[in-house]
Amino acid sequence: MLILNQRTQQLATDSVALAYDERKRSRLKVTLASGAEAGIFLERGDHLHGGDKLAAEDGSAVVEILAAPEKLIEAIADSPLLFARAAYHLGNRHVPVQILPTENGGKLRFQTDHVLAEMVRGLGCSVSDAEAPFQPESGAYGGGHHHGDESATDLHNPGHGPHRSVPKIHEFKPR
């Protein structure tokens, strides 16, 4: 079994498609597109994004991480104000959200949760089911990618209580 534990920018020799919940895990056994078995071993709190590449410990392979399509809720706001309200209410609940532009307002994608879908519908968004790769925003406590020398934090740890981590300024990078 290949051991994938080093980030790299080298050209990929194989790939694996992972859903968001899988990309959040620091330890994961996967089957690559080639059929080979591999183990992903990352620092705790380190998360993968579609497009990331991991090198095998023995240097024999470079695997590109693909964001697998998954079932999501898509909320479309037809004005900037409605978009801001919907994003605020989802963010206030610490919901991982992918933000996408539209001509008039914006589009929010989040994991399937019918209570949240009804909430944003009640705010005035048009809501539908979608199947797409999910690449949510990292958030204030998630930072960007972690590359070993940076402190690792959990995207779902809002930083409350005595374990509170130092907030990081958002890193807005093209994906």
UniProtKB/Swiss-Prot annotation:
SMART domains, per the entry: UreE_N
One cellular component term from this protein's GO annotations in UniProt: cytoplasm
One biological process term in Gene Ontology: protein folding
Keywords noted in UniProt: Chaperone, Cytoplasm, Nickel, Nickel insertion
InterPro entries in alphabetical order: UreE (IPR012406), UreE_C_dom (IPR007864), UreE_N (IPR004029), UreE_N_sf (IPR036118)
SUPFAM superfamilies in UniProt: Urease metallochaperone UreE, C-terminal domain (SSF69737), Urease metallochaperone UreE, N-terminal domain (SSF69287)
Region (Disordered): 134-175
Location within or outside the cell: Cytoplasm
Signal peptide residues on this chain, from the entry's feature table: none
A GO MF label: nickel cation binding
Major localisation: cytoplasm
Record's function text: Involved in urease metallocenter assembly. Binds nickel. Probably functions as a nickel donor during metallocenter assembly.
Annotated family: Belongs to the UreE family.
Protein name: Urease accessory protein UreE
Organism: Dechloromonas aromatica (strain RCB)
